[in-house]
Amino acid sequence: MVKDVISSMNVHMDKSIESLRKEYQKVRTGRASTSLLDDIKVDSYGTLSPLNQVATLAIPEARTITISPWDSKMIAPIEKAIMNSNLGLNPANDGKMIRLTLPPLTEERRKDIVKQLKRDAEDAKVALRNIRRDAIDQLKKLEKDKSISEDEQKRAEKEVQDFTNSHVAKVDEVLLHKEKEVMEV
């Protein structure tokens, strides 16, 4: 029973960290990344489709993303979707493909991005603490129901805290890595 509580908690904590990593992939650094365009939906013959389902995305240079639609009629809707995305990117269309050139980030913008990264990391830590609280509540309930002894409960709580500390350290590590990436000129 204790192992079930701890393994369930561990799975939830891992998912929280993975969610933070995915969120960080969408953050614009000075470098081009196709994950910037993950949330863009294109009007494809009356249906909203993810951009990567109607075109091939490539990164030929460090600050350039090329979008090659599978159907040339899709260039205008793709361009429109990018303009409406609030990413601050200006698509350049040559009739066959769309080029997105990412402007270099200003120092001020980099600092704003880092502040947002820190807020996201703090939110992830709050989620981890909530998961820890739920696990400890489950352990206390098991002890109250006499399913486990008080000693087992205390040992399990210490294990829960150790897992929480290691996951918080992982969040800090992910934040530090992304912060370096953003501040790199």
Curated annotation (Swiss-Prot):
Localization annotation: Cytoplasm
UniProt-listed InterPro entries: Ribosome_recyc_fac, Ribosome_recyc_fac_dom, RRF_sf
Alphabetized GO MF terms: ribosomal large subunit binding
One cellular component term from this protein's GO annotations in UniProt: cytosol
GO biological process entries: cytoplasmic translational termination
N-terminal signal peptide: none
Family annotation (Pfam families): RRF
Main location: cytoplasm
Keyword terms of this UniProt record: Cytoplasm, Protein biosynthesis
Its biological purpose: Responsible for the release of ribosomes from messenger RNA at the termination of protein biosynthesis. May increase the efficiency of translation by recycling ribosomes from one round of translation to another.
Family classification: Belongs to the RRF family.
Name of the molecule in the record: Ribosome-recycling factor
Native source species: Citrifermentans bemidjiense (strain ATCC BAA-1014 / DSM 16622 / JCM 12645 / Bem)
Chain's gene name: frr
